[in-house]
Every structure is written in C-alpha cells, then in structure tokens.
C-alpha cells in the first residue's frame, strides 16, 4: 500500500507557512481530479480508522454507504507507511491567514516529464506523514525522468539525475537527522522501462536500455549511486565541506 501524491511544502520555515502547507497537504481544497487530495482520503481510513470529515462532505454525492464493517476491514494494524513522492508545490500563509499557492520562478528546474524539482517536498512529505500517522516510513518511489542519450564515447552522462538524487537524498538525510523514522528509500528506478502512463517515452532508470536491441548501459548516475550505497550517503553534497557533489566516473 503506497499512494502517490504531490506534497505541499512551505515557502519558508516559519510556523505559519508550515501550518498552511500541512493544511493543504491533508486538505480537500484542490479539484477532485488532482492527486493532491489522496493523502488523507486514502491513508486516514487505513491508519486512523476513519475517513476525513472534510472529504466525506466534499464527496458526499459520489460515495456509497460506508459501514462499520467496512472500516473494520480497512483499518488494519500496519507496520509502516509507504509513500511515493516525486515533487511538490509551494504554499505560504496569506495575509488573511488562509493558505496561498506560490508560483515557481520562470526557468526553475524540471525533469524530463516536466515535473518540478522540489527536494523540499520529500523532507516535508516525510515530516507531515510522520506527524500524522506516527509510524515508520518507507519512501517507496522517488526518481526522475531525463532525456538520456548515448554520447559519442558510448556512455550515458546524466548529470541532471545525479544532481536531482543528491538533493532529494539530502532531504531524506535531514529528516533522519531530525529523528524521523525513515526505514527505507526505493529509487525509481533501476532500468529504463515501460512506464504505465507514458510507455517508453520517459527514462527513469540508472541503467539505459536500448529498446530495440535490449542492450544495457550503466549511466553515470548508476556509478554515483553505487558509491552512495557503499559509503552510506557520506558522499552526498550535504555531507561535504563546500556542499559539492562528488561525481563518480565509470
């Protein structure tokens, strides 16, 4: 059980902005076709044994009868929370006290899929989920698609993916350093593959796959990630004196 969602994260680390982001993350203000509402709607029944009142009111016209027997079946003792987190959106507390969406500056980084690069979302996703459900947590998916190509030297040089993963893993380490019970992180993904929504268009893998010949080429990020695992994260830029990324060559 691992929902996917965008994370509302605060524009600053002020208490007001953090509270506003948390309200939006677990709230129901977004359109019904937006995945941002799935956090509390899907996870509260499983972990807390009840549907959020706000969601019951919003979806009242579409819901079947929810019985006590339903909730007994849904609400089971689980060992951990699993969450897929790729990106998020910035929220601040407005002058009237209500949450406001903050536009990203033009030219800020995006992945090949067009998703924003927002490592803050991973930290605050972990933090907010831990505070709400009080269980150990796995990040069950995180990664990025890029426009990977084989270079003239026969290698795949995906520095953007290394930069992305360095920032997101730094966010995970911050959460761990602050005492949050992160017990695992799963990178999406090892091999370029058929993505359920985009087919072969998007390449998320650490290993490049030639879909015609099935040839595999380890990308630069694969060598870098090997060292991250070997060194238990000590080569992440957040652990370096000048915050530099230690790129690993094949």
Task: Tell where the protein language model's regions lie, with residue ranges.
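Active-site region of glycoside hydrolase catalytic domains
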Residues: 1-250
């Amino acid at each position: 059980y691992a929902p996917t969602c965008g994370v509302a994260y605060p524009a600053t680390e002020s208490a007001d902005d953090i509270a506003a982001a948390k309200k939006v993350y677990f709230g129901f203000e977004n359109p019904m076709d937006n995945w941002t509402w799935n956090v509390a709607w899907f996870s509260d029944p499983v972990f807390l044994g009840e549907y959020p009142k706000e969601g019951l009111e919003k979806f009242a016209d579409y819901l079947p009868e929810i019985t006590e027997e339903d909730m007994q079946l849904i609400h089971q003792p689980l060992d951990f929370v699993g969450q897929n987190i790729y990106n998020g959106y910035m929220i601040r507390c407005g002058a009237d006290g209500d949450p406001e969406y903050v536009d990203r500056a033009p030219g800020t980084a995006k992945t090949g899929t067009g998703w924003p690069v927002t490592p803050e979302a991973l930290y605050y996703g972990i933090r907010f989920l831990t505070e709400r459900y009080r269980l150990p947590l796995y990040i069950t998916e995180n990664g990025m698609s890029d426009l990977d190509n084989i270079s003239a030297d026969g290698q795949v040089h995906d520095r953007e993916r290394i930069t992305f993963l360095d920032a997101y893993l730094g966010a995970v380490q911050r959460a761990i350093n602050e005492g949050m019970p992160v017990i695992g992180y799963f990178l999406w993904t090892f091999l370029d593959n058929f993505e359920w929504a985009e087919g072969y268009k998007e390449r998320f893998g650490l290993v490049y796959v030639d879909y015609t010949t099935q040839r595999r080429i380890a990308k630069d990020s694969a060598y870098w990630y090997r060292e991250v695992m070997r060194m238990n994260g000590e080569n992440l830029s957040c652990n370096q004196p000048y915050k530099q990324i230690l790129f690993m060559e094949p």
